[in-house]
A protein has these predicted regions:
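Hydrophobic alpha-helical transmembrane segments and adjacent interfacial helices
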Residues: 327-339, 357-367, 382-397, 416-421, ...
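Soluble extramembrane domains flanking the early transmembrane region of eukaryotic membrane proteins
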Residues: 2-286
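Membrane-helix interface "capping/anchor" motifs
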Residues: 311-320, 340, 364-377, 422-433
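Hydrophobic core segments of alpha-helical transmembrane domains in multi-pass membrane transport
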Residues: 13, 302-309, 358-361, 416-420, ...
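Core alpha-helical transmembrane segments of integral membrane proteins
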Residues: 289-365
């Protein structure tokens, strides 16, 4: 058996190797995959057929290797031996192992398998490092592997958290590893720094091909620095855990580069990816991101918002209903979400009812009392909320200062309150601006229920902050790609068109309509006293309803036959 294995290796050595960044050839032999350092390779794993990966001709100046394998959503197992041991194997969609080379060793192997019933498409690569490079996960005390270069990823609706094990200093072949926690000076692993990178996949692209292609840009240090965005730099004293805002349906790849500033060397962990949704389960599936209830709710909301964008100031009571709906609905949703465990559809239905009540109440306040101050205060606060949300949607929202809830909410509230105060002397302009900006933004929210757009997170991030305490520590980075530029242009075009149209339309007209209740009362008194007014002779409502009912009854009454029906007298 050993002779047969050597014969197979001799045959492999005689075969030409493919050049380029990725090898896409099939198996070199049945159950055996040959790899080259720094070369990606595509292959398919099946459940009854495990594969063995082999790397030959390893240079003598290489002290350790990181072999990593990736798939889209199906789990793959990588191990040092055929027998799976907790400290020598890993299972997941993005997994890797560190192989510490022995003196004179020039070949190493790994075992690859999957327990999934369907074939799994994978891409894998072995990367080599020297004794001067730090070892990712070399001081692991939290996870199962002895040396763990993997990034562990957890997500929920609010945030996505990555965790990784601390690195250790590199060392020569055959030497003992440096101690992890005995010293804390510049001669120990405490001098290492960790750069956390984030890379966004193309929006609305959930294909396996796109993921495996873009993962190749996040495996090696130079490509990571050139392609991804550095979010934060951690020191050895910081906790090796970073949180990000969850972007449901948007593919994101994370990686960490550990740097040794003393030797000016670096190494990359194994990148991890997520869509913050599932490809397997029915609930929260990536292929059906928008719920039917969300689509119905935000579509109707957008239709009303589009009407308000162009005609809100002219139809004043309709605008008050719209603004009151937003004002009450937002706070009601936060309240019942934090106090109850109701499902999303029930929460949305109750929010719609509460918002409608709030809208009717605000319109009724204006109709009965005719006071502009509370109505325009509500309108101005809604506009201020949108302006404040846009402010924290910028990189300003990632400042460490605003991770404190008190500072964040005080600053947020001050910006929201300043907006109506600034426009105190020009209330009509305030109202028209609110109609144009808020009404047009409702269209953006409706688009998000059908198609992912980062602009929806302008307000969703604030909602998450109000609902989830731990969201305060999350980075709020979002992609800004072609779709977002198009939707931003649509939002701006609608807002500018609506504001311009209403300003031109209202030129020369009264700033606001007169008091509705006084008009109604004056009209009623006029009809009572003026007998020449035709409306004076209109019967009361009760008599008119009785008359209508009598006419309806006549339609169903059986028609009497004509002619004499009594017998003739003799």
């Amino acid at each position: 058996m050993g002779l047969l294995r050597l014969l197979v290796l001799a045959v492999l050595a005689s075969e030409p190797r493919a050049a380029g960044g990725a090898e896409t050839v099939g198996n070199s032999s049945e159950g055996l995959l040959e790899f080259s350092v720094g070369k990606f390779r595509y292959f398919t794993l099946k459940r009854p057929s495990p594969e063995e990966a082999i790397l030959r001709h390893i240079s003598s100046n290489v002290t350790f290797l990181i072999f990593q394998i990736h798939s889209q959503y199906q789990n793959t197992t990588i191990s040092f031996s055929e027998t799976l041991l907790p400290n020598a194997s890993g299972t997941g969609t993005d997994k890797g192992l560190v192989f510490i080379l022995r003196p004179e060793q020039s070949m190493c192997t790994w075992h690859l398998a999957t327990l999934d019933a369907k074939p799994v498409q994978n891409v894998a690569i072995p990367l080599s490092y020297s004794e001067r490079d730090p070892i990712p996960g070399g001081c692991n005390l939290e996870f199962d592997l002895d040396i763990d270069p993997n990034i562990y990823l957890e997500y929920n609706f609010f945030e996505t958290t990555i965790k990784f094990a601390p690195a250790n200093l590199g060392y020569a072949r055959g030497a003992d590893p440096p101690p992890c926690d005995i010293q804390t000076g510049q001669g120990s692993r405490w001098r290492l720094q960790y750069d956390v990178y984030q890379y966004f996949l193309p929006e609305n692209d959930l294909t396996e091909e796109a993921l495996l292609t873009h993962l190749q840009r996040m495996a090696e240090v130079p490509q990571v620095k050139a392609s991804a965005v550095k979010v934060v730099t951690l020191t050895a004293n910081d906790k090796t855990s970073v949180s990000f805002s969850s972007l449901r349906g948007q593919g994101v790849i994370y990686n960490v580069i550990v740097r040794d500033p003393f030797l000016n060397t670096s190494a990359a962990y194994v990148p991890a990816h997520t869509y913050t949704c599932s490809f397997v389960t029915t609930e929260g599936n990536c292929s059906s991101l928008g719920r039917v209830s969300s689509k119905v709710f935000f579509t109707l909301f957008a239709l009303l918002g589009l009407f308000i964008c162009f005609f809100g100031h002219r139809f004043w009571k309709t605008e008050l209903f719209f603004m009151g709906f937003i004002f009450v609905g937002f706070f009601f949703y936060i309240l019942i979400t934090r106090l109850t465990l109701l499902t999303y559809d029930v929460l949305l239905a109750l929010t719609a009812v509460a918002g409608s009540v709030g809208g009717v109440f605000l319109a009724a306040v204006w109709w009965r009392f005719g006071v502009l101050a509370p109505c325009l205060l509500c309108v101005g606060l809604v506009l201020g909320f949108l302006v404040s949300s846009v402010t924290f949607f910028t990189p300003l929202g990632n400042l460490k200062l605003f991770r404190d809830d008190a500072i964040f909410w005080v600053t947020f509230s001050c910006i929201a309150v300043v907006i109506p105060l600034v426009f105190t002397g020009c209330l009509r302009i305030l109202n028209i601006l609110s109609c144009g900006l808020v009404g047009s933004y409702s269209v953006v929210l409706a688009i998000h229920s059908y198609l992912y757009t980062s602009l929806s997170y302008i307000t969703l991030n604030v909602l998450k902050r109000a609902l989830h305490v731990d969201f305060r520590g999350a980075f709020l980075n979002v992609p800004f790609q072609t779709n977002d530029f198009i939707i931003l242009a649509v939002w701006g075009m609608l807002a500018v068109s609506g504001i311009t149209f209403q300003i031109r339309r209202e030129r020369g007209r009264p700033f606001f309509p007169p008091h509705p209740y006084k008009l109604w009362k004056r009209e009623r008194e006029r009809r009572v006293t003026n007998i020449l007014d035709p409306s004076h002779h209109i019967p009361p409502l009760r008599e008119r309803l009785r008359g209508r009912l009598a006419q309806i009854k006549e339609l169903f009454r059986k028609e009497q036959p004509a002619g004499e029906r009594t017998p003739l007298l003799l």
